[in-house]
Amino acid sequence: MACATLKRALDWESMNQRPPKRRRCNPFGQAGSNAGPASPSRDGPSTSAGLPHTPSNRFAKDSTEPSPFSESSLAKMSPDKMAESLCNEIKRLHKRKQLPITSSALERMQDSESSGSEMGPESPRRPDSPQNLMRHGEKALFTFKQVQLICESMIKERENQLRERYESVLTTKLAEQYDAFVKFTYDQIQRRYEAAPSYLS
């Protein structure tokens, strides 16, 4: 009875070895995007995968330091302060002839400012209020362009205050960094002179 045998090419070749496959050709520039996750090495798992990601000391220090703008000298805009600034801006523009409003509208604004609330159509009138204000209570005081002019002036003033505050803080920080740099340079120079060998040594 005859039997057929198959001879292996190499004696040390593994019996369960998979046949070699050709590597797939990837277009240029896509080799990194199509690559799979990195496999652990044979010696052991990689240290980068086992250790958690921690920020550097410099960034950790910056995150713990309080921001110089947290306690800014600029007070927050409360509704009362905003109303006061708005009335002052209206009076200033009226004096400069940039806000043409009637005297009755200006008196109405001052009356509403002293009363503490705007005189609306549904709000109760004070007993000492003039009759013309009660009659023309629903009439608008300013047009849209006038309101836009007032808001632009207030925003510009607030922007100038914030810019001055930012520049002062930035100047202080730059001065501190310069002083630290000068001190570090001086210490390095002193160490070099101290470590330099003398003639007697």
From Swiss-Prot:
Keyword field contains Ubl conjugation: yes
KW Nucleotide-binding (keyword) present: no
Gene disruption: observed consequences: Homozygous embryonic lethal; early to mid embryonic stages. Embryos display a range of somatic body wall muscle defects. Embryos show morphological defects in the heart, such as abnormal spacing between rows of aortic cells and abnormal patterning of the aortic outflow tract.
Motif (Nuclear localization signal): 20-25
Lineage top rank: taxon: Eukaryota
Swiss-Prot/TrEMBL keywords: Developmental protein, Immunity, Innate immunity, Nucleus, Phosphoprotein, Ubl conjugation
Bias (Polar residues): 44-57, 65-75
Cellular compartments annotated: Nucleus
Misc remark: 'Akiraka ni suru' means 'making things clear' in Japanese. The name is given based on the presence of the clear nuclear localization signal.
Family affiliation: Belongs to the akirin family.
The protein's name: Akirin
Gene encoding the protein: akirin
